[in-house]
């Protein structure tokens, strides 16, 4: 069938066949299908959608467009965690070592940040010498010896997604649930982990702004993964304010390590326990209450922290930086944002907080931007807190040579106060399995 006819059928709301979807994906990857036809196809999908079967076929065609990573050389239950992206999200730095300390195998490939969301690889590279590029033998060895490894994605992993996402980004077709699900799951299923825990963020700092859309995305991704023979669970978590207190790179490493040493923010630790419980239910058959108890034990007795140190050492990082935070990159100047009135914090625009951190140099405005590892923010107050005039709302870690006024103004506008008390939303909104 001609590409024109496939586009027309989807435009008219008809269901596509597996060969038709395969033809579109293959043609776009090999260059025989031009951008303008792929853009038309994506817009047709955006408006007409795809059913579960079509979305699974699209995911599978994208998954097989490049390298597939076998984990046959790893002994034990391999599990991955994927977050749909948020602000202050250093979860992988803590969850991986926690699960490794409890006997699971975490073979994780992570990405870099862009825009208001940070990237796991960027945070780890705040540690001097830390290498996110391991060959296959080193990757397998790390998981077998330590139980956890975090590396960057290989160059030829799901090339279809790289090309399709770049086109979606400039054709206003990013926020399509079938296309989001296929993008995420094609990358996750290209690596042969036995289990996958999805952290689907919901709120102002997430791609999914409301719970209904997030739940629809979660259900679709769980079905795709299950159909592919994997164990998959999705946790829907609140991203109406940043996760934890720190936003940046080195500052988030510090908060992650503090959490591994059992002195992190309570809300962040509770998310770690929830995600870990889902992974342990898959891989160790534990109930949620049993799993959360065991997570508390490995945080309290230092086993999870020990796994993080082992991972850093294996991947070439300077362990002394973890043992002594003063060795990590640090900003030269500290400033604070103070309240100009009494009241209660009613709302924190999480996306704006992320953009403010990016403007300080903690993130990328473009894919070629250079990150300043030492700068960042600390949110001192949270939704529901009572505020007096002059109270510090946030701390800023700045370096000279950059106009920080835009970031400071953005931060000020992001934190809203009201005269009456507001009750903060719970962190865990739902679990889909």
Segments the model singles out, each with a brief description of its role:
Residues 1-88, 309-318, 430-433:
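Acidic, glycine/proline-rich low-complexity segments that act as flexible tails and inter-domain linkers
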Residues 5, 10, 15-18, 28, ...:
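Well-ordered secondary-structure scaffolds
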Residues 47, 93-105, 187-192, 227-228, ...:
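Alpha-helix C-terminal capping segments
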Residues 60-83, 136-166:
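Self-splicing inteins and homing endonuclease
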Residues 77-100, 104-116:
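Glycine/serine-rich anion-binding loops at beta->alpha junctions
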Residues 109, 143, 151-153, 199-203, ...:
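Short beta-strand segments
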Residues 123-149, 219-225, 229:
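A glycine-rich helix N-cap at a beta->alpha junction
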Residues 145-193:
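Phosphate/diphosphate-binding glycine-rich loops and adjacent basic-rich segments that engage nucleotide
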């Amino acid at each position: 069938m001609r590409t024109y006819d496939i586009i027309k059928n989807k435009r008219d709301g008809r269901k596509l066949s597996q060969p038709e979807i395969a033809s579109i994906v293959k043609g776009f990857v090999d260059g025989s299908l031009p951008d303008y036809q792929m853009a038309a196809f994506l817009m047709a999908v955006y408006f007409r959608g795809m059913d579960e079967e079509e979305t699974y076929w699209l995911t599978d065609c994208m998954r097989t467009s490049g390298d597939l990573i076998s984990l046959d050389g790893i002994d034990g239950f391999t599990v991955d965690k994927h977050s749909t992206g948020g602000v202050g999200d250093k979860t992988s730095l803590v969850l991986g070592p926690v699960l490794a300390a409890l006997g699971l195998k975490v073979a994780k490939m992570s990405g870099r940040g862009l825009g208001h969301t940070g990237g796991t690889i960027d945070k780890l590279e705040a540690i001097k010498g830390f290498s996110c590029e391991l060959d296959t033998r080193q990757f397998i060895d790390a998981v077998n010896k330590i139980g956890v490894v975090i590396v960057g994605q290989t160059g030829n992993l799901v090339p279809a997604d790289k090309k399709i996402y770049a086109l979606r980004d400039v054709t206003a077709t990013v926020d399509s649930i079938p296309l989001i699900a296929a993008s995420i799951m094609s990358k996750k299923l290209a690596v042969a982990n036995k289990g996958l825990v999805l952290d689907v963020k919901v709120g102002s700092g997430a791609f999914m702004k409301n719970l209904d859309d997030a739940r629809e995305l979660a259900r679709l991704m769980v079905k795709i993964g299950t159909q592919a023979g994997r164990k998959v669970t999705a946790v829907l978590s609140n991203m109406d304010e940043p996760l934890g207190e720190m936003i940046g790179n080195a500052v988030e490493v510090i908060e992650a390590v503090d959490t591994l040493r059992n002195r992190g923010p309570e809300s962040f630790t509770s998310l770690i326990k929830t995600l870990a419980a889902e992974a342990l239910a898959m891989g160790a058959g534990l109930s949620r209450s049993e799993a959360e108890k065991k997570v508390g034990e490995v945080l309290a007795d230092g086993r999870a922290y020990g796994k993080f140190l082992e991972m850093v050492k294996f991947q070439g990082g300077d362990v002394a930086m973890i043992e002594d935070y003063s060795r990590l990159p640090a900003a030269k100047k500290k400033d604070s944002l103070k309240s100009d009135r009494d009241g209660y914090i009613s709302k924190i625009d999480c996306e704006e907080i992320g953009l403010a951190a990016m403007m300080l140099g903690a993130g990328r405005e473009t894919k070629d931007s250079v990150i300043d590892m030492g700068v960042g923010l600390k949110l001192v107050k949270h939704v529901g807190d009572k505020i007096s005039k002059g109270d510090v709302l946030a701390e800023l870690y700045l370096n000279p040579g950059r106009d920080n006024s835009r970031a400071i103004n953005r931060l000020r506008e992001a934190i809203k106060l009201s005269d009456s008390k507001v009750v903060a939303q719970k962190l865990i909104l739902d679990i889909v399995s």
